[in-house]
Amino acid sequence: MKAIGFNRPLPVSNPEALLDIELPEPELRPHDILVAVQAVSVNPVDVKVRAAHTPAAGQYRVLGYDAAGIVQAVGSEVRHFKVGDEVYYAGAINRQGSNAQLQAVDARIAAKKPRSLDFAQAAALPLTAITAWETLFDRLDVNKPVAGGANALLLIG
């Protein structure tokens, strides 16, 4: 399969910072879904991992954590997804990323894509939504549920 990866942390201005590569199709673990990636987003974690990680000799690292796509196969323990489902997710930092045609993702961190969103919109949500949630409820300790929250608008910045 085609992917975009790197084999050493070069400055982004270097033409070899990101490379078009060919990789074998990912193998599924029991809880995985195989996703044909339709859209991805770029997050600060992509930049940080690329700057700090050097793959083993002859290996490539594929970046990309937020993505949306179509399920192509399911692992033996997957119960909530089937082939053809449209999904979105934030992948795992310890696995190959979403900047590839196919990505193996733990189904327990994926969700069915809302019908009201296209693939690009869905791919833009996972890490930003997690960041907003953690900021509001873990850092600022906003009580859940917020009384009158349905009528509130939070503007930051």
Predicted features along the sequence, with ranges:
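Short structural boundary motif marking the start of a folded domain
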Residues: 1-4
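Short polar catalytic/cofactor-binding loops
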Residues: 7-11, 40-42
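Glycine-rich beta-strand-centered segment in the early N-terminal region that forms part
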Residues: 24-41, 51-94
